[in-house]
């Protein structure tokens, strides 16, 4: 019998230029809200807020 996955792959999008720079694995069980992280965007060439897409 196959168990359900406890993690899923998400993509982070830059708020300024809307480029999809990062992909992460997120736990379905512990984190219910959308992820927001300040990371470096290579297109903007600065640190910007990146949000999770669905």
Swiss-Prot record:
GO biological process, one term: translation
Keywords: Ribonucleoprotein, Ribosomal protein
InterPro entries membership: Ribosomal_bL33, Ribosomal_bL33_sf, Ribosomal_zn-bd
Keyword Ribosomal protein recorded: yes
NCBIfam families: PRK00504.1 (NF001764), PRK00595.1 (NF001860), rpmG_bact (TIGR01023)
Pfam family, one: Ribosomal_L33
Family: Belongs to the bacterial ribosomal protein bL33 family.
Domain of life: Bacteria
GO terms for cellular component: cytoplasm; ribonucleoprotein complex; ribosome
Gene Ontology molecular function: structural constituent of ribosome
The name this protein goes by in its record: Large ribosomal subunit protein bL33A
GN (gene name): rpmG1
